[in-house]
UniProtKB/Swiss-Prot annotation:
This is Large ribosomal subunit protein uL6. Part of the 50S ribosomal subunit. It comes from Streptococcus pneumoniae serotype 2 (strain D39 / NCTC 7466). Pfam families: Ribosomal_L6. The lineage of its organism: Bacteria, Bacillati, Bacillota, Bacilli, Lactobacillales. SUPFAM superfamilies: Ribosomal protein L6. Gene3D superfamilies: Ribosomal protein L6, alpha-beta domain. This protein binds to the 23S rRNA, and is important in its secondary structure. It is located near the subunit interface in the base of the L7/L12 stalk, and near the tRNA binding site of the peptidyltransferase center. GO terms for cellular component: cytosolic large ribosomal subunit.
């Protein structure tokens, strides 16, 4: 029994869900998301509640059931509240700037790195060393934040680099002299 798949998704006020042959469109105050799901999972909308049902209890169906429910719930949360990831930069001279929708990063290279914001993603800079990536799609927000982090991931000796806020970076000792 998939415990996640059996949970009911409650639609918040202002969120509409349309299911057209397992192509689900979710509209809300922050925007609209569309995704195609497996035809094996039946999606039922009853008022403000959405339930998912699977045809049998095979292992494959259970995994698809739980995954579909989680993806659908992320769509509902995204169009109603949105998602955001915060990154912090540590290092001498490491800073970020916004040029329109482009994020320009100075992270100790001979040239600045430029990151174009994908569709539906916004960058905010509360200060020059903090980056906030926000949008309605959890998947795209996470991928964009991971890409920004990959431009200079934290190194274990001095801890310099771009990291998620609250991320623990394990530190190593340097070489011991003679």
């Amino acid at each position: 029994m998939s415990r996640i798949g059996n949970k009911v998704i409650v639609l918040p006020a202002g969120v509409e869900l349309a299911n057209n042959d397992n192509v689900v469109t979710v509209k809300g105050p922050k925007g609209e998301l569309t995704r195609e799901f497996s035809k094996d999972i039946e999606i039922r909308v009853e008022g403000t509640e959405v339930t998912l049902h699977r045809p049998n209890d095979s292992k494959e169906m259970k995994t698809i059931h739980g995954t579909t429910r989680a993806l659908l719930n992320n769509m509902v949360v995204g169009v109603s509240e949105g998602f955001k990831k915060e990154l912090e930069m540590r290092g001498v001279g490491y800073r970020a700037q916004l040029q329109g929708s482009k994020l320009v990063l100075a992270v100790g290279k001979s040239h600045p790195d430029e990151v174009e914001a994908p569709e539906g993603i916004t960058f905010e800079l509360p200060n020059p060393t903090t980056i906030v990536v926000s949008g309605i799609s959890k998947e795209v927000v996470g991928q964009t934040a991971a890409y920004v982090r990959s431009l200079r991931s934290p190194e274990p000796y001095k801890g310099k680099g771009i990291r998620y806020v609250g991320e623990f970076v394990r530190r190593k000792e340097g070489k011991t002299g003679k």
